[in-house]
Design a protein with these regions (language model features):
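Basic, amphipathic alpha-helical/coil surface patches used to engage anionic, phosphate-bearing ligands
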Residues: 1-215
Length: 215
């Protein structure tokens, strides 16, 4: 038993050392990438290291590929969101349907987002894109320090052909992991990751739904 315990402790120590070394390598690459992108685009100075790291991880820590992708993102952002953010007055036809809600945090500290697909109506594609950016910015502003993910509950009840104009929406939200579950097990499935106090009341939880524009 003592040999087994010593073996387990040794493995845990080795894992900790490897994790520390990996973090040091990642942090070093974040610093290198920051210097490169700031030299190309001074506006990169306004972005925190978590954002830089996110792009690095998306390109398997390849600094060149991550830098190119990040600079492309900055150029897009400057063109599509010239004022730095999307205002509610720019997306009135999307907000009126109350289809996206911001809740509390799940058990892992991730913000909870609820999307009602059946409330989506075909509309101007450019306004839809602005709405997606508005939504993602709202979500990011609610993320605790160090958190990089959020949970999304995609409720497709009532969704049909008239709601199918969602290609741009789904593309922008492709980072989401969508899990389809049977209605009879929906609440228990959600409670695996969300405390009842944070679960939306629409799913027999205790927290009222909060429209994205009021979050």
């Amino acid at each position: 038993m003592e040999l087994l315990e010593n073996g387990v402790e040794a493995n845990e120590l080795q894992d900790s050392i490897l994790k520390m070394e990996s973090n040091e390598i990642e942090q070093s690459k974040v610093g290198i990438m920051r210097a490169l992108v700031e030299a190309e685009d001074p506006s990169a100075k306004e972005v925190d290291n978590f954002m830089i790291r996110r792009f690095l991880r998306a390109r398997d820590l390849d600094i060149e590929k991550a830098s190119n992708l990040f600079l492309k993102y900055l150029r897009w952002r400057q063109t599509f969101v010239p004022n730095g953010s999307i205002g509610a007055s720019e997306i009135p036809n999307e907000l009126v349907h109350n289809k996206v809600f911001m809740q509390g945090l799940d058990k892992n500290g991730r913000p909870i987002v609820v999307i009602f697909g059946g409330r989506h109506k075909q509309n101007n594609i450019e306004e839809l894109k602005r709405f997606v950016v508005y939504t993602l910015d709202k979500i990011c502003s609610r993320m605790p320090g160090g958190q990089e993910k959020f949970m999304c509950i995609a409720d497709l009840k009532g969704w049909g052909y008239s709601n199918s104009d969602i290609r741009g929406y789904l593309a922008a939200l492709s980072i989401l992991q969508i899990i389809f579950v049977e209605n009879k097990s929906l609440r228990s499935t959600l409670l695996n990751d969300i405390d009842e106090s944070q679960l939306p009341d629409a799913y027999a939880g205790q927290l009222p739904l909060v429209p994205i524009q009021d979050a």
